[in-house]
Protein backbone atom coordinates (compact mmCIF):
# COMPACT_ATOMS: atom_id res chain seq x y z
CA UNK A 1 0.00 0.00 0.00
CA UNK A 2 1.49 3.35 -1.03
CA UNK A 3 1.75 6.40 1.23
CA UNK A 4 -1.01 8.03 -0.82
CA UNK A 5 -3.34 5.08 -0.21
CA UNK A 6 -2.51 5.06 3.51
CA UNK A 7 -3.25 8.78 3.77
CA UNK A 8 -6.60 8.37 2.00
CA UNK A 9 -7.49 5.40 4.24
CA UNK A 10 -6.56 7.37 7.36
CA UNK A 11 -8.82 10.29 6.41
CA UNK A 12 -11.67 8.02 5.22
CA UNK A 13 -11.65 6.34 8.65
CA UNK A 14 -13.03 9.66 9.95
CA UNK A 15 -11.01 10.07 13.16
CA UNK A 16 -12.24 12.68 15.64
CA UNK A 17 -9.32 14.88 14.55
CA UNK A 18 -6.62 14.78 11.89
CA UNK A 19 -3.40 16.71 11.49
CA UNK A 20 -3.69 19.72 9.22
CA UNK A 21 -0.57 18.62 7.31
CA UNK A 22 -2.33 15.35 6.39
CA UNK A 23 -5.45 17.21 5.25
CA UNK A 24 -3.35 19.65 3.22
CA UNK A 25 -1.40 16.80 1.60
CA UNK A 26 -4.64 14.98 0.71
CA UNK A 27 -6.23 18.04 -0.87
CA UNK A 28 -3.07 18.80 -2.84
CA UNK A 29 -3.03 15.20 -4.14
CA UNK A 30 -6.48 15.87 -5.59
CA UNK A 31 -5.35 19.11 -7.28
CA UNK A 32 -6.36 21.71 -4.67
CA UNK A 33 -4.05 24.64 -3.78
CA UNK A 34 -3.73 26.18 -0.35
CA UNK A 35 -4.25 29.92 -0.42
CA UNK A 36 -1.99 31.38 2.25
CA UNK A 37 -3.65 33.61 4.75
CA UNK A 38 -3.43 34.81 8.28
CA UNK A 39 -5.46 33.58 11.19
CA UNK A 40 -6.86 30.18 12.03
CA UNK A 41 -8.37 29.24 8.64
CA UNK A 42 -6.88 28.07 5.36
CA UNK A 43 -8.69 28.21 2.04
CA UNK A 44 -8.16 25.56 -0.64
CA UNK A 45 -9.04 26.43 -4.21
CA UNK A 46 -9.37 24.55 -7.46
CA UNK A 47 -10.55 25.99 -10.79
CA UNK A 48 -14.24 25.31 -11.34
CA UNK A 49 -14.88 24.26 -7.71
CA UNK A 50 -16.18 26.07 -4.65
CA UNK A 51 -13.49 26.97 -2.11
CA UNK A 52 -12.97 24.62 0.83
CA UNK A 53 -12.28 26.53 4.05
CA UNK A 54 -10.55 24.55 6.79
CA UNK A 55 -10.32 25.95 10.32
CA UNK A 56 -7.26 24.84 12.27
CA UNK A 57 -7.04 24.55 16.04
CA UNK A 58 -3.76 23.34 17.57
CA UNK A 59 -2.66 22.00 14.15
CA UNK A 60 -5.71 19.67 14.08
CA UNK A 61 -8.84 19.57 11.91
CA UNK A 62 -12.16 18.40 13.39
CA UNK A 63 -14.25 15.51 12.07
CA UNK A 64 -17.05 17.70 10.69
CA UNK A 65 -14.56 19.25 8.25
CA UNK A 66 -13.09 15.85 7.40
CA UNK A 67 -16.63 14.72 6.50
CA UNK A 68 -17.06 17.70 4.18
CA UNK A 69 -13.66 17.14 2.56
CA UNK A 70 -14.37 13.43 1.96
CA UNK A 71 -17.73 14.30 0.42
CA UNK A 72 -16.21 16.95 -1.86
CA UNK A 73 -13.41 14.59 -2.97
CA UNK A 74 -15.78 11.68 -3.56
CA UNK A 75 -14.25 9.51 -0.84
CA UNK A 76 -17.57 8.64 0.83
CA UNK A 77 -18.20 4.97 1.45
Per-range role (PLM):
Residues 2-38, 44-77:
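Basic nucleic-acid-binding interfaces
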Amino acid sequence: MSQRDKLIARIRARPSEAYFTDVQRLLELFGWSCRKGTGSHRAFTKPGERTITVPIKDEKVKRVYLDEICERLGLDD
